[in-house]
């Protein structure tokens, strides 16, 4: 199961890289549905190129209705805390959105959505690597892929980077410090950069709403 999820994720990442190499468009606001297939890609070529490095680790999907103990990961001092939002309409042909200031991109494969859907992603100013993804409760027909760079996070260059993953919360935790209870740990693939350190990771998502970078 883990291998199958990884193959699907890697295939989509490689497809995203090919598309990015053909486009330098950035989604900074709502676009028409017809632009979703080839007009929403953000230009984070370096992010996806980094994914072509060595796979260091794959963290398998986990879920527990009673909650899984995790710790939210903070941004590093190099990151400027601010509320950043990107929104666009994505159709059945797929597309991508990015928040460059948060080193974040999300890619929807063709067929993930049943029809044109307005997608909105917000990176908050909490000081943690956390995102609100709307519409809340949206379920995908195919997994979508989040790409998160690690360089501006507090785990970069530490052993914790090899145990950092995407975590799902049904509601927005009021306090992100200390021990948290995640409902899911998403399938996470961690890649190295030229330095050999964990540089970037992908999360495979089956639904929205509240996700963050966390560690066990």
Question: What are these language model-derived features?
Answer:
Residues 18-21:
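C-terminal motif of bacterial Sec signal peptides marking the signal peptidase cleavage site
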Residues 137-148:
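Contiguous beta-strand segments within globular domains
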């Amino acid at each position: 199961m883990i291998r199958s999820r990884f193959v699907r994720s890697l295939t989509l990442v490689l497809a995203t890289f090919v598309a990015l190499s053909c486009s330098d468009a950035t989604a900074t606001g709502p676009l028409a549905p017809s632009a979703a297939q080839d007009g929403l890609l953000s230009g984070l070529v370096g992010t996806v190129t980094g994914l072509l490095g060595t796979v260091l680790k794959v963290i398998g999907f986990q879920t527990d209705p009673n909650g899984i103990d995790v710790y939210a990961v903070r941004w590093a001092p190099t990151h400027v805390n601010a509320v950043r939002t990107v929104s666009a309409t994505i159709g059945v042909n797929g597309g991508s959105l990015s928040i460059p200031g948060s080193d974040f991109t999300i890619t929807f494969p063709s067929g993930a959505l049943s029809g044109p859907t307005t997608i909105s992603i917000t990176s908050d100013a909490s000081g943690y690597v956390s995102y609100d993804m709307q519409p809340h409760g949206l379920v995908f027909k195919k997994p979508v892929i989040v790409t998160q760079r690690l360089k501006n996070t507090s785990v970069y260059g530490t052993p914790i980077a090899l145990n950092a993953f995407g975590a799902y919360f049904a509601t927005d935790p009021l306090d992100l410090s200390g021990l948290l209870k995640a409902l899911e740990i998403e399938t996470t693939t961690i890649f190295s950069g030229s330095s050999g350190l964990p540089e970037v990771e992908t999360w495979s998502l089956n639904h929205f709403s509240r996700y963050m970078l966390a560690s066990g």
